[in-house]
Design a protein with these regions (language model features):
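Short acidic/His-enriched helical or mixed secondary-structure segments at domain edges of catalytic enzymes
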Residues: 149-170, 248, 252-266, 311-329, ...
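An aromatic/glycine/proline-enriched structural segment found at the starts
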Residues: 177, 214-277, 296, 451-455, ...
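Acidic/histidine-enriched segments that form metal/cofactor-coordinating
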Residues: 86, 90-203, 248-250, 254, ...
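M16/MPP (pitrilysin/insulinase) zinc-metallopeptidase core fold and M16-derived inactive scaffolds
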Residues: 53-116, 182-186, 298-327
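Extracytoplasmic
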Residues: 27, 34-37, 46-53, 65-70, ...
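Histidine-acidic residue clusters that define the catalytic metal-binding segment
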Residues: 25-32, 172-213, 244-248, 277, ...
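Non-catalytic, conformational "gating/processing" segments within enzyme and secreted inhibitor domains
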Residues: 168-169, 197-232, 444-445
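Bacterial N-terminal signal peptides
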Residues: 8-17
Length: 510
């Protein structure tokens, strides 16, 4: 662990310097609502840039049964379709000289339209963005293109060349079986085929309403602009249907395994476990320390990264999460505005060579079990707190990201960055250990593996026999070899009725 702690300390120092350079002083927020529209205004008069965000608490959880993919397809029709005054090609032509774009993305309970523009072009950009959301064209050619794009993602991208995402989605399908989160947000093949343009119009009219809306403006905008922009959205209906009812977070006691049969040169692995914790719960913050210690996304801090990659060379990286995580573009940071009302614990193992994949799975569970049984080491606790206090500031380092996390605070009731800044200095190791024992564990797991020879993988795990590691070079230290002997026998109890093997071409069909 000496290497791990040194890396933690160095990353913390880097984060301190970066945070001081990149994060501006907190801006005074504007009105919380304008004309019945919830708002977040973050003025930074010295900035030449202005960020706009239009957030709807609408997502794939709102999809009707049999029409999975409707909510995100509707969002694509707004963000990647024409308006009543312009075709989509004309929208793109109008955006080009502004050096701006309208980005649209969504998840289970969120749809976001956002963009950043120089303040000299703000009026034109705001007009374009508002027209896209408030006066969609709903043209037949836009519908055909966007629906085909969604279908291609599900049937070609996910099934074809995105094994890591395939593994994550396969895990989520089992973890959230018969749950509004159970299908890919983009939909299923049959669901997308069943959607009509009239379905899109109806969902837009019923769900894109003010009680599910937050409008955000940040940066160097002129006086009166933010209020005027928000007022434009007062034309939307006042109320949408109630948020979809979610079943209670299940207490799962037995492990479940899904192996997706696919011609794969390396095996992608995802592990999930339901947890009844979100940002509004006190335990979320000590769990955040635990997951950062175990596997901070795409950094060398985590135990999983050190033990699996650095010491054993098993894969590119291994990470842990205690809430839904989507990487924001090319950064290493979480995408804002994808909060959910229910969350899960997840471990993501980047693809592993077939001969070592089951050892890597056992190694990840071995380290998780060790954290649950022994607690977080005092030195690791202190180093992780220091790192996380600084690194979390980087999550909101520009106007658009600050705005996104401020909108999340409106929706969830907690500003995760500010909560970490306030809680970390006072947090005790005992709080982390207690939260880990209460919410984490290596039982009740949903495990997905994308692999060739899928039935053999399933049979090997069900047999309970050891699965060792094959090193490319000699000279492995004796203490690592001794630990390998423990890991290769780490138990993963599985019963036949909880094991499924699926051919990839059947995944996400309906």
């Amino acid at each position: 662990m000496k290497t791990s702690l040194l890396l933690m300390a160095s990353m913390a120092l880097l984060a301190i310097g970066a945070a001081g350079a990149a994060v501006a002083a907190p801006a005074k927020r504007g009105k919380s609502s304008v004309a019945g529209v919830r708002t977040v205004f973050l003025p930074s008069p010295a900035s030449p840039l202005v960020a706009l965000r239009v957030f709807f608490q609408v997502g794939s959880a709102d999809d009707p049964a049999g029409k999975e993919g409707l909510a995100l397809l509707t969002s694509e029709m707004l963000g990647k379709g024409g308006s009543k005054t312009r075709t989509y090609a004309e929208v793109l032509d109008a955006l080009y000289p502004l050096a701006a774009q309208i980005r649209v993305y969504g998840d289970k309970e969120s749809i976001v339209f956002e963009g950043t523009v120089h303040r000299d072009n703000l009026t034109k950009f705001a007009d374009l963005l508002a027209d896209q959301v408030l006066a969609p064209r709903f043209a037949d050619d836009d519908f055909t293109r966007n629906r085909q794009d969604a279908r291609d993602y599900v049937t070609k991208t996910l099934r074809g060349n995105a094994d890591e995402d395939l593994g994550k989605q396969a895990m989520a399908t089992i973890l959230f079986y018969k749950h509004p989160y159970g299908s890919p947000s983009q939909g299923t093949a049959a669901g997308l085929d069943a959607i009509t343009l009239d379905d899109v119009r109806k969902l837009y009219a019923s769900h894109f309403a003010r009680d599910r809306l937050v409008v955000g403006v940040a940066g160097g905008y002129p006086d009166g602009f933010a209020e005027a922009f928000a007022k434009r959205f007062a034309v939307l209906p006042a109320k949408a249907p109630p948020l979809p009812k979610l079943p209670p977070v299940p207490v799962v006691k037995r492990n479940r395994l899904i192996v997706v049969e696919k011609d794969a040169r390396a095996h992608a692995i995802s592990i999930g476990r339901p947890i009844n914790v979100t940002r509004k719960d006190p335990d979320f913050y000590p769990l955040t320390v635990a997951r950062s210690y175990l596997g901070e996304h795409r950094t060398f801090n985590g135990v999983l990264m050190i033990r699996l990659r650095e010491i054993r060379g098993l894969n590119y990286g291994s990470y842990a999460y205690v809430e839904n995580f989507i990487q924001d573009g090319g950064s290493t940071f979480p995408l804002a505005n994808i909060a959910r009302r229910q969350q899960h614990f997840e471990i993501w193992l980047r693809p592993v060579a077939p001969q070592n994949s089951l050892f890597a799975l056992r190694a990840a569970l071995y380290e998780t079990d060790k954290l649950v049984r022994e607690g977080i080491p005092q030195a690791g606790f202190e180093a992780t707190k220091t790192f996380l206090a600084n690194y979390s500031n980087l999550w909101a380092q520009d106007a658009s990201r600050r705005l996104g996390f401020a909108i999340d605070a409106v929706v969830t009731g907690k500003d995760v960055v500010k909560e970490l800044q306030a809680r970390l200095p006072k947090m005790k190791k005992s709080e982390v250990d207690a939260a880990v024992r209460k919410h984490l564990g290596v039982n009740g797991l949903t495990i997905s593996i994308v692999a060739d020879k899928a039935q053999s993988i399933a049979d090997t795990l069900m047999s309970g026999g050891p699965t060792g590691i094959s090193y490319d070079t000699a000279g492995t230290p004796p203490d690592v070899v001794a630990e390998d002997d423990l890991i290769k026998r780490f138990p993963i109890p599985l019963e036949k009725e909880n094991v499924r093997v699926y051919p990839v071409d059947k995944m996400f069909e309906k």
